[in-house]
A protein has these predicted regions:
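Hydrophobic transmembrane alpha-helices
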Residues: 2-62
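Alpha-helical transmembrane segments of multi-pass membrane proteins, especially transporters
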Residues: 44, 48, 62-70, 84-85, ...
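Interfacial aromatic-anchored transmembrane helix boundaries in multi-pass membrane proteins
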Residues: 28-39, 67-100
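Structural signal for membrane-spanning alpha-helices in multi-pass inner-membrane proteins
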Residues: 24, 28, 51, 70, ...
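Helix-boundary and loop/linker segments of multi-pass membrane transporters
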Residues: 9-13, 37-38, 78, 82-83, ...
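Membrane-embedded alpha-helical hairpins and interfacial helices in multi-pass inner-membrane proteins
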Residues: 36, 115-189
Length: 189
């Protein structure tokens, strides 16, 4: 006899996942291309709103669903979609998005540096996750540029400059996202 596993997901949770999926797609389309294989988009900032609201489990489901849907051909990423997107320099950031809910859960549990101040605690946790996201994204970008595109010159200074610009803009966005995140959490709990 086989054992049945009862998986119960509320209709409200399914609706939240659907709404946040649509909002994630919209946020990825709000993108400004910058030189040397990079984009500045609202997608990274929006990712930081998904996990606190949906939690690590459903946040992961959402990002995996987003990644798989894009790889299957839906044009939902910043510059399209399809299986060939794994050869885009920005695909590493999408990989990092799927890991972020678990990292965020671990970092937020372990971060007691500012336990008396919720904003600082959340901001530091978000910045740690942002650094992880950019490290994975930058490493993947360098790998693709060097081994797939074969452009060794851009892996140096100019690529570093555009990646730094992208990171600094994300640092500013995450500050405001943290403010919004705390307000949203306060209202839904």
């Amino acid at each position: 006899m086989s054992q049945q596993t009862n998986v119960s997901v509320s209709a409200q949770t399914i609706c939240k996942i659907g709404i946040y999926f649509a909002l994630l797609v919209v946020s990825s389309k709000v993108a400004i291309p910058i030189p040397f294989y990079d984009y500045i988009s609202l997608q990274t900032a929006f990712i930081f709103l998904i996990y606190p609201i949906l939690g690590a489990k459903y946040g992961s489901w959402l990002t995996v669903l987003y990644l798989v849907s894009g790889l299957l051909g839906l044009p939902i990423f910043a510059s399209g979609g399809g299986l060939g997107y794994i050869f885009k320099t920005t695909f590493g950031f999408l990989i990092a998005f799927t890991l972020m809910p678990f990292l965020a859960a671990v970092v937020r549990k372990g971060n007691k540096l500012f336990s008396h101040h919720q904003f600082l605690n959340t901001l530091v946790s978000n910045y740690i996750c942002l650094i992880m996201d950019h490290l994975i994204g930058f490493a993947y970008k360098c790998f693709i540029i060097k081994f797939y595109i074969g452009d060794i010159i851009n892996v140096t200074g100019i690529l570093g400059f555009t990646s730094l610009l992208d990171f600094l803009i994300d640092v500013g966005l995450i500050f405001f996202v943290t403010l919004a995140e705390l307000q949203i959490i306060k209202r839904i709990h």
